[in-house]
Amino acid sequence: MKNKGFIAAASALMLMSPFASAGNPVQMWKCNINGDVAEEAVMAQAGKWKAAASALPGGEGMMVWSLYPVAVGADGDGTDVKLVVAWSSFTAYGQWWDAYPASDVAQLERETMTCHGSALWESEDA
């Protein structure tokens, strides 16, 4: 009888361990700057976007970076900037993503740049 309890507990731990050790979600958008918009305008707009996006459910503590190429080869997509967003958990990301597409925040990203693709990554501390 003790073996059954031990096996059940060990099985539950094995099933739950991927969730306990899950890293943080990071989404990266590949974007083109619209026309002759300056980098400073893109950064200012990214700040406005972050403030509005952080107010959505799951957005608390969200981190946002704008990445500009310094020395690169062509990526084939004409990417001028990458918008990188990280959340504290996949639960927070899920809440945020459920609210984002229908929100006014989604329109803000189009004021200075047009994003043509994104990928969701899992980050792990080294």
Descriptions of predicted regions:
Residues 1-8:
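Bacterial N-terminal signal peptides that target proteins for export
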Residues 9-13:
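Hydrophobic helical h-region of N-terminal Sec-dependent signal peptides
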Residues 17-18:
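N-terminal signal peptide c-region/cleavage motif recognized by signal peptidases
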Residues 22-26, 32, 61-79, 104-126:
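Glycine-rich beta-strand-turn "strand-cap" elements at beta-sheet edges
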Residues 36-38, 86-92:
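Helix N-cap motif at beta-to-alpha junctions
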Residues 38-65, 100-105:
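Short amphipathic alpha-helical segments
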